[in-house]
């Protein structure tokens, strides 16, 4: 049998086998979905930002503020800070570390990164010292993890959280950020 006829025969046989035995391409459809469970809302008090250069701002988190949820209540204690980097796209990338002291006296160390995509309106409100909300922004989501020695809150060492921005204000008299926090299941 000439080589070209053998090649055609093998190709035909392979094609028939694939069709007969039900070969299909891998599916690209979604196979799972994260579930979010509300954990708490918190308001962190902030000092005005220190501008290092056009791409880096540092914000100290002040003592006080609050965190409240169905099974948690507490306030922020020092140390705490937020390093904001302006990316080439104009988006802000957060790098945050804060300490939360619960009403039971337990310490929770939160660290998170995230992305802020401002609009002209949100930047104008921020510059004017006005409150801006999630409706003013294109995108503002962060992903905290928590470390603690607390028995009550030990489960937080084993879960990923998501912060969804609620509102903020940046002024000399009243600077804060507020988030709703969810456990990803």
Where on the chain are the PLM-derived regions?
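Bacterial N-terminal signal peptides that target proteins for export
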Residues: 1-13
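Beta-strand-enriched cores of mature, soluble protein domains
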Residues: 30-185
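Sec/Tat signal peptide C-region and signal peptidase I cleavage site
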Residues: 25-29
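Bacterial N-terminal signal peptides
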Residues: 12-23
